[in-house]
């Protein structure tokens, strides 16, 4: 230690470490400088264990203090180095004890007293040959009372940031300082910060100042009355504790004073809830106890929540419920195997969508197709009447069940004459409508499917031969059609309000008077109604007072397929022509396409128009005479349904559900 610098200049840490008199083995301290080492405490010739520990531990701290200006501990550090080495431990320990007693522990040594008075920078002669300088410009030594253990807590001494801030605030005349003023005080009064006032070197300690101000309860921020000025920081008269207060989290909703009361109430409530087992079982957190919280797990709240979920899981949201019209199309597959749909809503969709034409109807399609197949309608039969009826039926164009061809595209069910193929694009199409099978095809609307999926068709189930309307009515298809007509309105009303209203009006009119029903139908604007009205007028003229609807139906259903076809052509010729223009405008191709395009009109109107009750009165009609007299006159009617007939799926309304295979079902409704 003789080589140790004897000048009063403080030793740099590097010089102390490189001093050959120091032995590293004697100071095995790593990251434990605040702690006392038992071996140092037990070292001999030490006035007290405390002093011994201090003499050893502060050694490197002395290096820091020489930089920092921490006066008290610097001497102890340097002394500690001497103790560990060849220096006389007795003198060094005594000197260290004197130097480590700043202010409070004045052992009588001038340097120690000076250090306690913030001026303990005078070098101390530890040995005659080694005067160790104790330049302690550190005012930090005087800024706070030394702890029982003289080892420094911080580079500037034992005072914490909170202590320094407290000193700064208390030193002000108003007992309040702004943040910038606190910074200034630190730089001015604490030697350690004197050279650390610039922006680069002050970032760290200024940040610590801010943290201590906000995290310690001893400080309070008071809004500054001046505009644009920073807040005042004062000593909290209530919560200020001497020394460093326990660390707490930044002010937030959880620990802010503003929420302390509410937090206390919440804690009490939580304890009470936990005391009650029924409510506390499922409440891990007090947040779950909030009554409006969906995360609530209390028994009553959980029940309410699950009830809400159960309500949302009603049948309306399930495919099996059959209660949601939105899911009707998806539910049709399930209905195929059933006798009939449980709810008309499934088939209430518009004719364009007409779920009735979809799979649920397909169950009955084979029967209808069989009936249509039984009908041998000549290819030359008028298609106009068929198109009109089909338009009213608004059923998607059905594919021909028999090989004959598509007899009725407008109807949801295929109405094909078993006769030589599709037949003439114009003639065969309409004739099938009025053939016995044509009555079957008249209406296979969602209403029919709703009613047991039986075609509420008006087709006479009778054979191709001329048959009276009575035969047709006697057939099962007619009975089903009657049921459908009677029940179609309420079912359709469920399916669609507009359709139900129209059907109700039509049914009432039809039941009251076929003439009125047909008259009302044109007002409704259905193509089929107009066509039927024209047919009825024609048929009534020929029949002489027989019900127009019954006549038209009888003409269509009872006459020979060929004669019926021509009669249908003729009957529909006036109406079909007028309707053809409308249908052409709608579908751009033909009455049939119009019917396909306007399936809603068809499936609303035609079945209701063809209420079988009307046929009870005048079933006996000379269909041949009527056909010859009136219907045959309209042979010149030119309606091109080639595209519609040739393509079973011509109209977008054509639902793929009605395929020829489905039409090929063995069930036949033809009575004879």
From Swiss-Prot:
It is a peripheral membrane protein. Residues 299-672 are annotated as: Mediates interaction with CHUK/IKKA and IKBKB/IKKB. Pfam families: Forkhead, FOXO-TAD, FOXO_KIX_bdg. Deacetylation by SIRT1 or SIRT2 stimulates interaction of FOXO3 with SKP2 and facilitates SCF(SKP2)-mediated FOXO3 ubiquitination and proteasomal degradation. Deacetylation by SIRT2 stimulates FOXO3-mediated transcriptional activity in response to oxidative stress. Deacetylated by SIRT3. Deacetylation by SIRT3 stimulates FOXO3-mediated mtDNA transcriptional activity in response to metabolic stress. In the presence of survival factors such as IGF1, phosphorylated on Thr-32 and Ser-252 by AKT1/PKB. This phosphorylated form then interacts with 14-3-3 proteins and is retained in the cytoplasm. Survival factor withdrawal induces dephosphorylation and promotes translocation to the nucleus where the dephosphorylated protein induces transcription of target genes and triggers apoptosis. Although AKT1/PKB doesn't appear to phosphorylate Ser-314 directly, it may activate other kinases that trigger phosphorylation at this residue. GO terms for cellular component: cytoplasm; cytosol; membrane; mitochondrial matrix; mitochondrial outer membrane; nucleoplasm; nucleus; protein-containing complex. It comes from the Eukaryota. It is found in: Cytoplasm, Cytosol; Nucleus; Mitochondrion matrix; Mitochondrion outer membrane. The modification N6-methyllysine is found at residues 46, 148, 229, 261, 270, 289, 418. Residues 282-297, 409-441, 548-577 have a biased composition (Polar residues). Disulfide bonds: none annotated. The modification Phosphothreonine is found at residues 32, 178. The keyword Iron does not apply. This is Forkhead box protein O3.
């Amino acid at each position: 230690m003789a080589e140790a610098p004897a000048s009063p200049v403080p030793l740099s840490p590097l010089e102390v470490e490189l001093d050959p008199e120091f032995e590293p083995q004697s100071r095995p301290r790593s990251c434990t400088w605040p702690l006392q080492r038992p071996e140092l405490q037990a070292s001999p010739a030490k006035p007290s264990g405390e002093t011994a520990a201090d003499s050893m531990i502060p050694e490197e701290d002395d290096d820091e203090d020489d930089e920092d200006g921490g006066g008290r501990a610097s001497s102890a550090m340097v002394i500690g180095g001497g103790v560990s080495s060849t220096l006389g431990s007795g003198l060094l320990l005594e000197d260290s004890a004197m130097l480590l007693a700043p202010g409070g522990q004045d052992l009588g040594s001038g340097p120690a007293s000076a250090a306690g008075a913030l001026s303990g920078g005078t070098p101390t002669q530890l040995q005659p040959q080694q005067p160790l300088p104790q330049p302690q410009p550190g005012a930090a030594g005087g800024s706070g009372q030394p702890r029982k253990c003289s080892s420094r807590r911080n580079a500037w001494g034992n005072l914490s940031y909170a202590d320094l801030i407290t000193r700064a605030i208390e030193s002000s005349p108003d007992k309040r300082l702004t943040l910038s003023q606190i910074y200034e005080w630190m730089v001015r009064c604490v030697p350690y910060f004197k050279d650390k006032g610039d922006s680069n070197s002050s970032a760290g300690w200024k940040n610590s100042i801010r943290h201590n101000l906000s995290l310690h309860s001893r400080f309070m921020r008071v809004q500054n009355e001046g505009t644009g000025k920073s807040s005042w920081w004062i000593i909290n008269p209530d919560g200020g504790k001497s020394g460093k207060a326990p660390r707490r989290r930044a002010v937030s909703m959880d620990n802010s004073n503003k929420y302390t009361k509410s937090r206390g109430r919440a804690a009490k409530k939580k304890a009470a809830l936990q005391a009650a087992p029924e409510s506390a079982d499922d409440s891990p957190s007090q947040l779950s106890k909030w009554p409006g919280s969906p995360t609530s797990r209390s028994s009553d709240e959980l029940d309410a929540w699950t009830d809400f979920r159960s309500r949302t899981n009603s049948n309306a949201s399930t495919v099996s419920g059959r209660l949601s019209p939105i899911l009707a199309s998806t539910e049709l597959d399930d209905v195929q195997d059933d006798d009939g749909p449980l709810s008309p809503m499934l088939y209430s969709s518009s004719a364009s969508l007409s779920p009735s034409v979809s799979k649920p109807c397909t169950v009955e399609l084979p029967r209808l197709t069989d009936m249509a197949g039984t009908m041998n309608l000549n290819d030359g039969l008028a298609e106009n009447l068929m198109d009109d009826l089909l338009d009213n039926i608004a059923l998607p164009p059905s594919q021909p069940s028999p090989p004959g061809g598509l007899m009725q595209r407008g109807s949801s069910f295929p109405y094909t004459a078993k006769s030589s193929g599709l037949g003439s694009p114009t003639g065969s199409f309409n004739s099938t409508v009025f053939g016995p099978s044509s009555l079957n095809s008249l209406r296979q609307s969602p209403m029919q499917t709703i009613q047991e999926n039986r075609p509420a068709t008006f087709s006479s189930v009778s054979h191709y031969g001329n048959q009276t309307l009575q035969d047709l009515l006697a057939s099962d298809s007619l009975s089903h059609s009657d049921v459908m007509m009677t029940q179609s309105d309420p079912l359709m009303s469920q399916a669609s309000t507009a359709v139900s209203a129209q059907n109700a009006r039509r049914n009432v009119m039809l039941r009251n008077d076929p003439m009125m029903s047909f008259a009302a139908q044109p007002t409704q604007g259905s193509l089929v109604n107009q066509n039927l009205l024209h047919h009825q007028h024609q048929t009534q003229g020929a029949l002489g007072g027989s019900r127009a609807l019954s006549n038209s139906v009888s003409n269509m259903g009872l006459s020979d397929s060929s004669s019926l076809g021509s009669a249908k052509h003729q009957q529909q010729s006036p109406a079909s022509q007028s309707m053809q223009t409308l249908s052409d405008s709608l579908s751009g191709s033909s009455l049939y396409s119009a019917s396909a395009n306007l399936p809603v009109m068809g499936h609303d109107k035609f079945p209701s128009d063809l209420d079988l009750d009307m046929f009870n009165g005048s079933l006996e009609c000379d269909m041949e005479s009527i056909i010859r007299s009136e219907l045959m006159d309209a042979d010149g009617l030119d309606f091109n349904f080639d595209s519609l007939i040739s393509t079973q799926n011509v109209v977008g309304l054509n639902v793929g559900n009605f395929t020829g295979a489905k039409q090929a079902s063995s069930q036949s409704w033809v009575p004879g």
